[in-house]
Amino acid sequence: TFDNNRSTRIFELIESHKSIDYKVFKKIKYDNKFPTPFNYNFMDVNNIMEMKPTEYPDVADLIEQIQNWDRSTDVNSTGAGAYAMFYYTLADKYFYKSYYDRNFSKSLIADCLVEVKKRMKKYFNSTTIKLGDFQKLVRGDKEMPIFGMPDVITAMNASTYKDGKVQVTHGESYIQLVKFSSKGTEIESIISYGSSDNEESPHYNDQMELYSKFKTKKMSFDKDYVLKNARTTYNPK
């Protein structure tokens, strides 16, 4: 089988509970941690956790940041920032799609970290970078820090943006959570940007803040409630 970080982490979380209620389900759905060890199904970078910082003085600080990291891909995590820059630099500089189960050596990882450090200094004037400083959610003129990385449950994949940063282009998008209870059907949802593709609309990017904080908005299919709380009502022409 070809398990990966996502499937491994999901299995770990599910197995840790005897039963799963709505609250626990949401916690699992929004989990953004990598498992230990990493379990990519196309490469192996676990040697990075076995490297002795003292043996690689030029990048000792980056090795320590990654090794001391709790593996959460939170926007304020410097460990996640260092690892994300390592991941995208590795893919950009060394990784080839024709190789599977590629086991990256300590020396190759060290070479990659040297390149990471150069980019950190060039674009951020620091070697301590939060994930949210490096990875952005962008829509129109709005830009904000965003969680996630490829192959965590809250997966995010990014491409080159500007000033040494990356911009999320794939991953978490429309989310709808439905609960059937004694109160009836309860629905909450969110989308990564907004509900309109019209750049002039206030709904072009008005859900980004909620989305970036793992929040949702309540939905209702009760016609009376919707009409009572509508900002405007109109008939399409």
Task: Name each region found by the language model.
Residues T1-M43, M49, E55, D61-K237:
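C-terminal/peripheral segments of proteins
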